[in-house]
Amino acid sequence: VVKLAQEMGLVKLGTVAIDGTKIKANASRHKAMSYERMQQAEGELKAQIEALLERAKSTDAAEADEPEVDIPAEIQRREDRLKAITEARQRIEQRQRDADIERGRSPDDERKPRDDEGNPKGGRYKREFGVPEPKAQDNFTDPDSRIMKRAGGGFDASYNAQTVVDEQVKIIVAAELSNNAADVGQLVPMLEAVKVNTGKAPEQALADAGYRSEDNFQALAGSGTELVVAMGREGKRCAEVDAQKTPHTAAMAAKLQTDAGKAAY
């Protein structure tokens, strides 16, 4: 559809606007479980299975008057539940390992932050490598979804839908779904998706403060697309930017003070 619109001359790719919105997943938040609760539930289910196995071995006359209990079925039900919880726990742990590696951590870092040369920077990570936070969650009906905050308040199992819209003709030129609630990691891949879909980069891209990061600005510095990204929420004063530590962010802040920057924003 995008290519057809482009062939018809409808897609201009002068200025595009990037934004994200949370879409509720087809999954109940009541079907989610925290990492801490998973660990507790695994222990409880293992104990129940062991007790049922012992009961099957030692059935006596005292149970003759009790309603018949299908012990194999009860064991199977608990084993199925245990398997589902164990798989969910392992998914959370794998996600945490992947996230830690992306942040520059390693399994043997001894919880000590290090610089690019491997030298300790001081301080200490609050948890071991790959160990999730107790409140980290996984959903049994839609494991790919994540608990995200709703715009009106509260939380749901959701996805973060990203769109890039041609500002002149209001045509969506790229759309993707992410299970990361934060927008900041989507700026580079969404602009790359525009190039994949249309064969060219937009001249200018507008985005709100959720996409602001020094890494984003640096990665897109030579992309051929002029970025105009807000420094903070409208009407709120932003902290001073250190031009020595974050030169690209400082340049963006300066651009937003110009007439051209204000007009674009």
Map each language-model feature to its residues.
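Anion-binding and metal-coordination hotspots
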Residues: V1-Y265
